[in-house]
C-alpha cells in the first residue's frame, strides 16, 4: 500500500497525478533495488497518464521526470531551457476540480467540429510557447507575462478555462502580476 501526503491540490491542473506516479515508481525501484533510468520512469508515468486521462500530451510526465524548465513538443520530446535566475511565481487555486481526460476529450471534439477555427488557436499556443522560451533566455519577464496573458486568452478561446479562474487571473493582473494564466 502507498499513502500519499501532499499540499498540491488534486485535479487542479498542476500535474500532481504524474508527480505521484513518478515518485512511486522511483520509490518502488529503490525498495526492490532495481535501477530505473529517467526514460524508464517517463515511460511508466506516460502509460499511467494514458490509462487515467486517455490521450494526454505527455507534458506533465516529462516535466515531472526531468524537472527544470523544458520546452515540450508532443511527439518530438523536450529541450531543457537554461534559466539563470529564479522566476517569482504564485500559484492560485480556485478550488474547482477538473478532469484532464474530460478536457482533452472536449478539445479533441472541438477540433473535429471546428478544425478551421481551433487548429490555428492551438498553433498560436505553440508559437506563444516558443516566444516564451526566448523571453526566458533573455530574462524578459515583462514579455513572458504578456505571453502568459496571450496564452490564457487562447485557452479561453478553446474552452479550457472557467469564470472563477478568469477572475483569479484578472485579480492577479490587477495586483501587478506581469502575466497570469
Please state what every model-predicted region is:
Residues 1-44, 165-174:
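Anion-binding (especially nucleotide phosphate/pyrophosphate-binding) glycine-rich loop
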Residues 34, 43-53, 61-181:
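C-terminal nucleotide
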